[in-house]
Amino acid sequence: MTSLIRSLPVLILCPHARCNCRCVMCDIWKETSQSELTAEELTQHLADIEELSVKWVVFSGGEPLMHSDLFRLSGMLRARDIRVTILSTGLLLKRYAHQIVTRIDDVIVSLDGPAHIHDQIRRVPGAFAQLEQGVRAIHDLNPDYRIAARCTIQRMNYACPSETVRVARRLGLSAISFLAADVTSDAFNRFQPWEAYRQAQVALTLDEVWTLQRELENVDRDWDGSGFVAENAEKLRRISDHFRAHLGLVRAQAPRCNAPWVSAVVEANGTVRPCFFHPPIGSLKSHTLLQVVNGFEAQQFRGALDVASNPVCAQCVCSLNWR
């Protein structure tokens, strides 16, 4: 792969720095700044977005729906035939149901398990009920509107993936995907990687890994071929193997991924990363998007990156293999 990027089909924008949940596996909620990507700032980069042939923008977080003018941003992008997806906690879906249905292409909500487990992990009383009400409000407006779920596996929900899939189906969601919790990187607003005691609060013991493996095998047995669970058997096995690697029982193995060559992550303060987990390659506060993704630092990074042997890639829980 060349180190020079001529097209960037996927752009992940974090329009707002804060979040309205307090999840045990994430530190974004600790952010106190009001940083957000303004419409004026986005306007400055629209020409580069078009030149890079961006096809899909994903609004990630923090919680995108906390942005003061999110639907203006989405309108600017959709006017250029760019698909816009929101990753959301689900707490604000009901409030913005009409705007979502008319101005966002699809939504992916966080779903951590059945109601009591979801609320415990989110540390927001009634979070599941608000998610359920939001999904219903959107589907009342458009029964075919696509809302998928993503479940992050960790110590508080490792024993209930099968039940989580059933909950997602009962909610009327379109699909569900699973990933392992990241416990080693400085992503998700960690000022430094977690110490061992903090990792142990989220990662699994060996007995828990075996329980998780059986659960994921049940998910594959019950839902294989349905199209409802995004991961196949191999990808589900990678989740339990990720926790085995954390225990030192197997070698951590990087997934197939081309994220640094086909995507970029722009944080609310303008910081640009090649993916969620690798260090920044520049900032939109001082350069244009095109200057950053094809700047010296970015090209040096991509030119030297061997995904298969890179230790950060080996720990990755959220890869992208764009075709």
Residues of each region from the PLM?
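Conserved alpha-helical substructure of the radical SAM core
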Residues: 1-99, 103-106, 204, 208
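Radical SAM enzyme [4Fe-4S]-AdoMet core and its adjacent flexible, acidic
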Residues: 14, 32, 37, 80, ...
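Alpha-helix N-cap/loop-to-helix initiation residues
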Residues: 66-67, 93, 154-158, 282
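Flexible mid-to-C-terminal extensions adjoining Fe-S/redox cofactors in radical SAM and related proteins
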Residues: 1-6, 29, 247-258, 265-323
